[in-house]
Amino acid sequence: AELNAVDERNELTATGRELAKLPLDPRIGRMLLAARDQQCLAEMLVIASALSVQDPRERPLEAQEAADQAHRRLADDKSDFQSLLKLWNFVQEKIEHKKSNRRLTDDLKSHFLSPRRVREWIDVHGQLATIAREQGWRVDTSPASFEQVHLALLAGLLGNVGTRILDADRGEPPYAGARGIKFHVWPGSPLLKKAGRWVMAAELVETSRLFARTIANIEPGWLERVGAHLLKKSHTDPHWEKKAGQVMAFERATLYGLVVYAQRRVPYGLLNPEHAREIFLREALVEGELETRAPFFAHNQRLVREIRELEHKTRRLDVLVDDELIF
């Protein structure tokens, strides 16, 4: 259900049927399908292949500071996925201008990159590109936006999102995740001190604590666009709104227990037509809150005014029946 591959009857959706044809991990496959639709397949082939192999960046114990400094040059402060794209471009440039394989190997090592893992990354990228070609997918040549790439990633990572806990105690996990979990940002991430209110992670790793690795800042609105099939919605305080001219309610949506939005005004008529009609009759018609030039409404309002004037003149308060009887 998370990948929108099956419906509420547990039958394959159109997305599920496409995923079933791909010889890939379902999450990776879902990202690629979304990337095809978002027109960012070139970027996703790079990221998906990177997520399928061991991280090529090395951090030897005897040179941790130097390695961190080298890796920071290719880091992005909003997304670890963007850092992978920068790293790929760096590697491709080195390959393009290599003088020999030996020189290339030495060059990669000097930047604390594992030549063997880089080769694995390139090989897997080639395999994914072949699959995309066999499916007849078009790889766009123009660069995709941050939003396009991360919407596609989110399609495969909806279960790995988190929102910042604003009142978290020092040392406590700063993020609340899906289904009640809490997690920290991986210490090696450039986003450690720059992570936003909402993040998504490629993976959650349990060591001494639960950590989110390879993360990116995301917008809560993206969760609606990509995860609409998973949102649980509830509605409160249905009421007549004179300005809107209809019965409205407040909507709250959650994704795996995380509040995506709350107190959103939505039309109530489509949600509960019978109750909305009752509120309309009581608050709009009986209480005279409806703004209309309809003859029947003007007639009723005139009768109410005349009866109230009669009550005032006769000093009786029981001529006009109460709202319940009018309703």
Where are these regions (language model features)?
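Extended, charged helical/alpha-beta scaffold domains that provide interaction surfaces
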Residues: 2-10, 15-327
